[in-house]
A protein has these predicted regions:
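Extracytoplasmic gate region of multi-pass secondary transporters
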Residues: 11-16, 224-275, 335, 369-370
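Central cavity-lining transmembrane alpha-helices of secondary-active solute carriers
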Residues: 38-54, 268-281
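Cytoplasmic membrane-interface "Motif A"-like loop-to-helix N-cap segments
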Residues: 57-69, 286-299
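Cytoplasmic helix-loop-helix junction between adjacent transmembrane helices
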Residues: 99-137
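Glycine-rich segments within core transmembrane alpha-helices of 12-TM secondary carriers
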Residues: 128-154, 359-370
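Symmetry-related core transmembrane helices of the 12-TM Major Facilitator Superfamily/SLC fold
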Residues: 168-187, 392-411
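C-terminal transmembrane helical hairpin of 12-TM major facilitator-type secondary transporters
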Residues: 291-338
Length: 430
C-alpha cells in the first residue's frame, strides 16, 4: 500500500507545472491532469469495485487480492509508458488514463483485501489501532511522494522545457516501489494462509449455508441507514482532502507565495501527521469509544482548514502551515473512527462487499471533484501560470464539500446517540 499511495500522489506537488503546458514536452494542461487523475476512479465507479467486492467474499482475500495487485502494477507500468512514449499529448493522455483506470481498480481492491484481513486478524481486539497503523504506513508513501517528486523534477528557469524523461522520473521510482510491494504481497499471502490454518478458517466465505454470500445481502446493505451515512461521510470527507492533495502546489504556491519545495513540505504535513496520530487515535477509539464524536470533530477540523486556505490573508505562509495542521488532525481522526465502525454494523460474510461499496461511492466523489478542480484551474489560468483566483475558487468548492461532510458527521452522531444499539460509540470489547 506504501507503493500504491506513492504512485497515486507522485504528481501532487508538481501540479503547478500543468498550469503552463507550453513548458512541458508532455503537453498536458491542468484540465488534462485532472482528467488523468480522475481515471483512477472510473472502473471503480462503473461497477468494478462492487463486483470485485463480491468476488472477494466468494474467492477470498488471497486469490482476489493477488489478481488485483498484479492489475495495479500493470496499470502503473502503462502510465509510465505513456509519459515517455513521445505520443501526441491527447494520445498520451488517453493511454495514461487507461493505465490509471487499471491502477486505480487494482489499488482499491488491494486496499479492500488488506482492510478485510485486518478485520479478521484483529476481530477480538485493537482493530482501530491496527487499521490506523496500516493507514499510517500507507500514507508514508504519500508523504514520500510529496517530498521527493519536486527533487526528482527540479524547477527550471522561465522559458525552459521539461523533457519527457524528466517528467516521468517519479513514475519510474513508483514502478520500483511497486516491484518491492509485490514481493511483500507474496509474503502477506503466506502469512494470511498460515493464520487461517491455525484458526481453522477458510479464505472464502463458504461454510455454513446461512453464512453464504447472496446478492440479496447487497440490497440489505443499501437499506442500512447506518451504512449509508458512513459511506456518504466517506465520499465527502475524503474528497475534501484527497482531491485537494492532487492540486496542492497549484493552490498553496499562489495563495501563500511560497516556493515549490516549501509547498511540498507544507502539504506533506498531512501524511506525516497521520503516521503519528492515526494509530494513536485508533488506540483512543479502541479504549474509550465515542467514534461518531471523533468523526464530527475531524470533519469540523477539515472545514476550518479549508476556510483558512480559501480566505486567510494571501502571502502569509503561517496560515498555510496552520491549515495543514488542522487538516492533518482531521485526516487522522475520521478514518481512525470510521473504518472500524463498518465491521460493527455489517455481517462478516458481506464485509468485503461493504468495504467495496464504500470505496465505490468514495471514488465516485473523487472522480468528480478531481475533474472539477482541474477544470476550475484551467478556466481561471488560461495558460498564464499559477493563479491565486483559481486557487481561491477551488478552495471555495472544497469548503462546500466540507460543509456537507460536517452535516453528515453530525447526523451520524445524533443518530448514534438516539439509537445506542448501533454500538458505534462503544469502546473495543477487549
Amino acid at each position: 500500500m506504501f507503493a500504491s499511495y506513492y504512485f497515486d500522489d507522485m504528481f501532487s506537488t508538481l501540479s503547478h507545472l500543468f498550469e503552463n503546458p507550453s513548458a512541458l514536452q508532455l503537453g498536458w494542461n491542468s484540465a488534462d491532469y485532472g482528467l488523468y487523475t480522475s481515471g483512477y476512479s472510473v472502473l471503480c465507479v462503473f461497477g468494478g469495485l462492487v463486483v470485485c467486492g463480491m468476488l472477494l467474499d466468494k474467492w477470498g482475500v488471497r486469490i482476489t487480492g493477488s489478481i488485483f495487485v498484479a492489475m495495479m502494477a500493470g496499470g502503473a507500468a502503462l502510465v509510465t509508458y505513456s509519459l515517455v512514449s513521445g505520443l501526441p499529448p491527447k494520445t498520451s493522455l488517453s493511454v495514461a488514463y487507461i493505465g490509471c483506470m487499471f491502477f486505480g481498480l487494482g489499488s482499491e481492491i488491494a486496499g479492500v483485501a488488506v482492510t478485510r484481513s485486518i478485520a479478521k486478524w484483529f476481530k477480538d481486539g485493537n482493530m482501530a489501532f491496527a487499521m490506523g497503523l496500516q493507514l499510517a504506513i500507507a500514507r508514508l508513501g504519500t508523504a514520500f511522494a510529496l517530498v521527493i517528486s519536486p527533487k526528482l523534477v527540479a524547477a527550471k528557469a522561465v522559458g525552459q522545457t521539461y523533457s519527457l524523461m524528466e517528467t516521468a522520473r517519479p513514475a519510474f521510482l513508483g514502478l520500483a516501489l511497486m516491484a518491492a510491494g509485490m514481493v511483500l504481497w507474496a509474503a502477506f499471502v503466506a502469512m494470511d494462509a498460515k493464520f487461517d490454518r491455525r484458526a481453522g478458517l477458510k479464505d472464502s466465505v463458504d461454510t455454513a449455508e446461512e453464512d453464504k454470500f447472496r446478492f440479496s445481502d447487497v440490497l440489505k446493505l443499501l437499506k442500512n441507514k447506518r451504512f449509508i451515512a458512513i459511506a456518504l461521510l466517506c465520499v465527502f470527507f475524503y474528497s475534501s482532502i484527497i482531491s485537494f492533495k492532487k492540486f496542492a502546489s497549484a493552490i498553496l504556491i499562489p495563495r501563500f507565495d511560497v516556493p515549490v519545495e516549501a509547498a511540498s513540505w507544507m502539504v506533506s504535513m498531512l501524511p506525516f501527521a497521520t503516521v503519528v496520530f492515526a494509530p494513536l487515535f485508533g488506540i483512543v477509539v479502541d479504549k474509550i469509544g465515542h467514534g461518531t464524536r471523533w468523526m464530527l470533530i475531524g470533519a469540523a477540523l477539515a472545514l476550518t482548514a479549508h476556510l483558512m486556505l480559501a480566505f486567510a490573508p494571501s502571502g502569509v505562509p503561517f496560515y498555510g502551515y496552520l491549515a495543514m495542521v488542522f487538516l492533518g488532525f482531521g485526516y487522522s481522526l475520521v478514518p481512525a473512527a470510521m473504518w472500524p465502525s463498518v465491521p460493527k454494523i455489517v455481517p462478516d460474510k458481506v464485509l468485503g462487499t461493504a468495504f467495496s461499496l464504500i470505496y465505490w461511492v468514495q471514488n465516485l466523489g473523487l472522480m468528480s471533484f478531481k475533474m472539477l478542480a482541474g477544470k476550475i484551474l484551467a478556466d481561471s489560468n488560461l495558460d498564464k501560470g499559477v493563479s491565486e483566483s483559481g486557487a481561491v475558487r477551488v478552495e471555495v468548492m472544497f469548503v462546500s464539500v466540507c460543509v456537507v461532510a460536517l452535516v453528515l458527521a453530525y447526523a451520524l452522531n445524533l443518530y448514534s446517540r438516539r439509537n445506542p444499539q448501533m454500538r458505534l460509540d462503544l469502546p473495543d470489547k477487549s
